[in-house]
Amino acid sequence: MPNPERHGGKKDGSGGASGTLQPSSGGGSSNSRERHRLGSKHKRHKSKHSKDMGLVTPEAAPLGTVIKPLVEYDDISSDSDTFSDDLAFKVDRRENDERRGTDRSDRLHKHRHHQHRRTRDLLKTKQTEKEKNLEASSKSGSTKDRISGSSKRSNEENDDHGKAQISKSSNKESRSSKLHKEKTRKERELKSGHKDRSKSHRKRETPKSYKTVDSPKRRSRSPHRKWSDSPKQDDSPSGASYGQDYDLSPPRSHTSSNYDSYKKSPGSTSRRQSISPPYKEPSAYQSSTRSPSPYSRRQRSVSPYSRRRSSSYERSGSYSGRSPSPYGRRRSSSPFLSKRSLSRSPLPSRKSMKSRSRSPAYSRHSSSHSKKKRSGSRSRHSSISPVRLPLNSSLGAELSRKKKERAAAAAAAKMDGKESKGSPIFLPKKENSSVEAKDSGLEPKKLPRGVKLEKSAPDTELVNVTHLNTEVKNSLDTGKVKLDENSEKHPVLKDTKVQGTKDSKPVALKEEIVTPKETETSEKETLPPLPTVTSPPPLPTTTPPPQTPPLPPLPPLPAIPQQPPLPPPQPTFSQVLSSSTSTLPPSVHPRTSTLSSQANSQPSVQVSVKTQVSVTAAIPHLKTSTLPPLPLPPLLLGDDDMDSPKETLPSKPVKKEKEQRPRHLLTDLPLPPELPGGDPSPPDSPEPKAITPPQQPYKKRPKICCPRYGERRQTESDWGKRCVDKFDIIGIIGEGTYGQVYKAKDKDTGELVALKKVRLDNEKEGFPITAIREIKILRQLIHRSVVNMKEIVTDKQDALDFKKDKGAFYLVFEYMDHDLMGLLESGLVHFSEDHIKSFMKQLMEGLDYCHKKNFLHRDIKCSNILLNNSGQIKLADFGLARLYNSEESRPYTNKVITLWYRPPELLLGEERYTPAIDVWSCGCILGELFTKKPIFQANLELAQLELISRLCGSPCPAVWPDVIKLPYFNTMKPKKQYRRRLREEFSFFFLPWGALDLLDHMLTLDPSKRCTAEQTLQSDFLKDVELSKMDPPDLPHWQDCHELWSKKRRRQRQSGVLVEEPPPPKASRKETISGTSAEPVKNSSPAPPQPAPGKVEPGAGDAIGLGDITQQLNQSELAVLLNLLQSQTDLSIPQMAQLLNIHSNPEMQQQLEALNQSISALTAATSQQQDSEPTAPEESLKEIAPAPAVQPSAEQTTPEASSTPADMQNMLAVLLSQLMKTQEPAGNLEENNSDKNSGPQGPRRTPTMPQEEAAGKQTGHESH
């Protein structure tokens, strides 16, 4: 609808107001000349426009060509960073553009009217003549524009308003035309009544708007403008938002190209021309604004944020833009808002795209957008450097003063020129309002340029809805302020476009209403005095209700409320306020009349509205720079407005809805400012809301992270939240690769836990990878046979930089009393077949669970299999575990698994191994449970492979086809070929057939033929095991048997030092005897007698005491001791005979070794107790009849007696002789039992020492 009107130059000429008609008549020749120039200069201007767009600052872009000088100033102050064009070059280009721009404006207007092409040829001569005049006037204006920026636009406006009078009152007309351009923007919005004038103005202004659009500075300042030039870009919210966000030369260049294309296309030029009439007003407005351009740019420096926001927000709807236009400026000051607006803008801008999608609207919008782009670009500049605002405002104040004077002269000239042009009432109003706006609104324009545009846009909406659309597009590109205006206008525009020119009045009213809200918001943000400043009391009266209620209720009144905001800025600019205030009442009345009579009073209303808007905008802008965060709420509103205006004509309600929606979006978004977003009533109290929202978002941000903590709490309660001081450390029970393991008690629950320390002081790369891997895997493994990690605690309450503080973390596990290695080495327990079945069943269930979860343990050994006193088995230490993918068959390191439990494929260099490696390790443990010793104990990989080959046969292709593929098959061959003897060897250990068969399958050389964990559970040995019916093993409750404890005892024994740990009395005695006896056993080589003497070195006093004790023992006590020895001794018949008949050192030592093996309690403190309490063993034996009690006493006696080889021999001889004499049958039984037990136990003890060494080496390999 608006497009055809815009395109119809005749319609515009005839239907336009008198002001517009006169310029068209007088400017017909000028338009034709401009067209001619456009034809010739379009190409030049494309390049120049691309340059000029970069050169022309946002001021020039929004305000018109007149703004270019200001743009120069602003470019230096705020836009220099964003726009790289030189100021001098910009000035020259601006001058050229102004000269050409006036011609272009006329040409473009005619192009838009489609008469442009036809009249080009006819008017070429006229245009050339008029162009000369215009050039002369534009030159003078451009010079003035350079000086004040107002004369430049006055020339452009002169061209737009009347080329005949342009030469006379180029300066006056430039100012009036600037005001007129702003009015024309309103007229565009009010296009229905103002179509003719706007079209003629467009023709005249098109060059200006074109210049502004093409001016490199404008483009550079407002990438949105560039985007706006291209309808797609303008429409695309992303494009606008991008432009706002990125004031980049590339967008500018693109814009320039778009502009050039528009210039080239007559249709596009005509559209832009139709848009340019609003530009005209902005041109005059810009000329006045030019003087305040520093302020406007400064405000824009704040507005840049608003601009960015407004770009997206305004695109969707200018409602939010207007009401928040001051806010938008303030928003512009807040970068968060601008970003948010961008994020939101895409949807609204897309909606605006719909209206823009109409090609005529697009082109017109693009040209009006170029104007708005100018203002938007200024706001962008502010967004680029909001800090520059104050500097610009101070400089701008001086410039505005000078420009005010120029504006006054230009306004007078404009009034005269415009009156002569044929719209004396409209133009004088424009001149008065524009002059006053310039005087009072120069600074305001700078700050509230977006607001002014909004206000002017409503008037233009009345004049031309299509212009509104173009303006909306332009405003989207221009800046957030303009975007806000456009967003408000744009919803109306869409509706009006659909409705038609008739609807333009309501649309204009709506837009005006939106603008009043924005004005109100800006006023509220600014200060209560602003409304007071508003000179027109009637307007405030009308204004207050619109301001208080949401946008919808204020359709007509908003225009008035805009006026009240105007006066408050006026006080800020006292000079400008005085002139604009006087003009404001008429302008307010004209605006009201505009609402009532759209066509006739639209021009005057536009002028007055522009003046009001400028004043109001100026006030918000000043406040905006003061309150950068406040703009955020309006942007939110703008977003809301953008969405709903597109959807529905009622811009005010839509704004609220959209504001709410943006809030949700903002809440979702990480941007803190948007979250609060003044959703409840941004128009009423935008400042507080704007301030509050940023706080809310910050509060909400931690909440965003809360779910993660919540997830942790769900799976693991408060991991990492507690400190290790919540536990009472009882003692060290183990040592890991990255720290110690402590037994501790939870102070809160009294529960026993194991704290695995993760040290960070030795880590070069932070948290140890093994700990990370273990934590990650254990959190995924929940099984009764897998150790449970309860939580993670820190060693410092504040948990600051642990790396710097050499702090540590602690993995909190459920406490297990023993590990299998400690139990087997302690000799305190003898596992029955049922116990072995239970242990293996639980172990294989846990391993099968891990394998089914695709995890390889890769470190199964006795020390990593934990037991509690109830006989429950748990698989622990997942530091080497990793996720296994059977499909990818990727290589893994083969330096895993302790050497004694390492399968042959790893020894031969296999890197693509399978879960079968864990099954081999479990097979080794099964054999160890029966033999009481590791079955493969070697210290080197080659030796380990040799031991495996002796028992399981040499690896060869016959039994293992793939072995030849392994890297070390040729280098690590056994010394000779061995046959498999596993069943034969283990048959001596009286293994059950089921266990032997299972062991044979688990220790198969070929991993592909090795049974799986699931198959082991189905074996005859384990399938019928019912754990619930199993009796718990008789484990030592008085002593926790862990690897560390057993290693300590072993080292002490090897060094000849008695165990120093003081266990309970019983435990200590047992440990003492077993310690002395076990030490010789471990150290003893094939010739046990030799090692024993060296190891047993108690004091002579002790030996004597023991001798006395043994003599004091009665036969009953000896019988008890004999019974104990019968059940747990490894003595053989020949040994007993030797002891009885021959008292040689070797035999005595052998007996001592046998006793040590049979008695399996070792304690570090036995030596102390032995010295201090030589008689204690005796008493304990007497008091305690059970075998365990007697056993400790015997153990203690043995170490005491073994002070020297002679003493030991004597003591043993006496003891054994007495025992044998008194109880020969018992001795026979003892010998028989020893025969049975000696086989398995003797071998187990022997490898203990190598086992430890190998373990140490293996650990080193694992760590690598």
Curated annotation (Swiss-Prot):
It comes from the Eukaryota. ATP binds at residues 733-741, 756, 814-819, 1042. It is found in: Nucleus; Nucleus speckle. Signal peptide: none annotated. The modification Phosphothreonine is found at residues 57, 515, 692, 893, 1246, 1248. Residues 727-1022 form the Protein kinase domain. Keywords: ATP-binding, Isopeptide bond, Kinase, mRNA processing, mRNA splicing, Nucleotide-binding, Nucleus, Phosphoprotein, Serine/threonine-protein kinase, Transferase, Ubl conjugation. The modification Phosphoserine is found at residues 236, 249, 265, 274, 276, 301, 303, 310, 312, 318, 323, 325, 332-334, 338, 341, 343, 345, 383, 385, 400, 420, 423, 614, 644, 681, 685, 889, 1055, 1085. Pfam families: Pkinase. PANTHER family: CELL DIVISION PROTEIN KINASE, CYCLIN-DEPENDENT KINASE 12. Cyclin-dependent kinase that phosphorylates the C-terminal domain (CTD) of the large subunit of RNA polymerase II (POLR2A), thereby acting as a key regulator of transcription elongation. Regulates the expression of genes involved in DNA repair and is required for the maintenance of genomic stability. Preferentially phosphorylates 'Ser-5' in CTD repeats that are already phosphorylated at 'Ser-7', but can also phosphorylate 'Ser-2'. Required for RNA splicing, possibly by phosphorylating SRSF1/SF2. This is Cyclin-dependent kinase 12. The gene is CDK12.
